[in-house]
Amino acid sequence: MDFLQLLSCACIIFTVGMFTTGLTDLKKMKATQSADNVQFLPFLTTCLNNLGWLYYGLLKGDGTVIFVNIIGAFLQTVYIATYCHYTKEKRRVYTQTLLMVSVLCVAWVYFSLVISPGEAQLSQLGLTCSVFTISMYLSPLADLLDIMRTKSVERLSFSLTVATFFTSTSWTLYGLQLGDYYIMVPNTPGIFTSLIRFFLFWWFGAVIPQIPSYKLIQI
């Protein structure tokens, strides 16, 4: 097994492991018959991210990207369907889901019908997916600032931080090995935000085991 194959396996293992953290929320919803205290938007944005990268993987013919995002999109769809079943705010949830579907339709028309197949199509899709992934990695920064203000790490999940670090590192190295900056660059912020979390755990006290807060998505 060469280094690229090793990185591919690492990307699959760590990323799928991260996606399965949503199973905790799934079990919680089934046990309580309620979607209270479970965030819906992360499921939706991660699904959108997965589908975007799945399309990118199909255009590029990258089996690792395709496999990971098929699993990711499937799991997010299960989480979304479960949330829709148990939530009391069905109108809001259906509206947000419909908005996501609309965005997907517009994106598909643009990337499939407006842009001619080729390098420009792949580059624009890669750039779009990269920007979306970076925004997802940077979105928890407001929470980190709040943690620094309150000096409490109770809202952080150490296991999810570890998973994010290894997942981001694997994809960064994988993209670097392929020379694909659309894969490498958007995963770099995940490394830095994970290091910030590790520092906060060290600075503000011992690691507090808790149920992972399902927030992030990876390609």
Swiss-Prot record:
MF terms in GO: sugar transmembrane transporter activity
UniProt keyword annotations, A-Z: Cell membrane, Golgi apparatus, Membrane, Repeat, Sugar transport, Transmembrane, Transmembrane helix, Transport
Recorded topology in the membrane: Multi-pass membrane protein
Keyword RNA-binding carried by entry: no
Domain (MtN3/slv) ranges: 5-90, 124-204
Domain of life where this protein originates: Eukaryota
BP terms from Gene Ontology: carbohydrate transport
Transmembrane regions: 3-23, 38-58, 63-83, 98-118, 125-145, 156-176, 189-209
GO cellular component, one term: Golgi membrane
Gene3D superfamilies on file: 1.20.1280.290
Subcellular location: Golgi apparatus membrane; Cell membrane
Entry function: Mediates sugar transport across membranes.
Similarity remark: Belongs to the SWEET sugar transporter family.
Descriptive protein name: Sugar transporter SWEET1
Gene this protein is translated from: slc50a1
